[in-house]
């Protein structure tokens, strides 16, 4: 019985569960989607990490990219929509984590758009009734072209 309990503890602890960003990194973005999955971006200084998956489970996708490969879009101060985004590459696939405020209706939206070779594959939205943490505004990354 003791061996079974130890074996289960090792098995559970050996898999990285979805959690807050590691202590040496900062949360740039975090939300729960309409399908109860978590979108998370962490800034560790030299790297940016993106993860996606069910809360309290091993992420379905977790990538870490050198900071100089990640780009950002920052709102330029005019127009109806105040938009901010971070573009995280994984080969030819881009994960565009974004948030937007409609300045007329005050409707806030956030989520991730997944594209491959400039073709949009999926859009996943954060749940409107759940907390969104976004510190994309003002992040020091290369501007997107």
Where do the protein language model's features map onto the residues?
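Sec-dependent N-terminal signal peptides
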Residues: 6-9
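Cysteine-centric segments in proteins
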Residues: 19-145
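Positively charged n-region of N-terminal signal peptides that target proteins for export
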Residues: 1-4
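N-terminal signal peptide c-region/cleavage motif recognized by signal peptidases
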Residues: 14-16
């Amino acid at each position: 019985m003791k061996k079974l309990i130890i074996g289960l503890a090792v098995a559970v602890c050996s898999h990285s569960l979805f959690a807050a960003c590691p202590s040496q990194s900062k949360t740039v973005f975090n939300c729960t989607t309409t399908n109860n999955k978590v979108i998370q971006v962490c800034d560790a200084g030299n790297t940016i990490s993106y993860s996606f998956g069910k809360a309290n489970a091993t992420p379905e996708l977790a990538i870490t990219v050198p900071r100089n490969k990640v780009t950002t879009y920052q709102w330029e101060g005019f127009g109806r929509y105040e938009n901010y985004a971070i573009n995280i590459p994984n080969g030819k696939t881009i994960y565009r984590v974004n948030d937007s405020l409609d300045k007329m209706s005050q409707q806030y939206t956030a989520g991730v758009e997944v594209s491959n070779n400039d073709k949009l594959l999926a859009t996943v939205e954060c749940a409107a009734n759940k907390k969104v943490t976004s510190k994309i505004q003002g992040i020091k990354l290369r501007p997107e072209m």
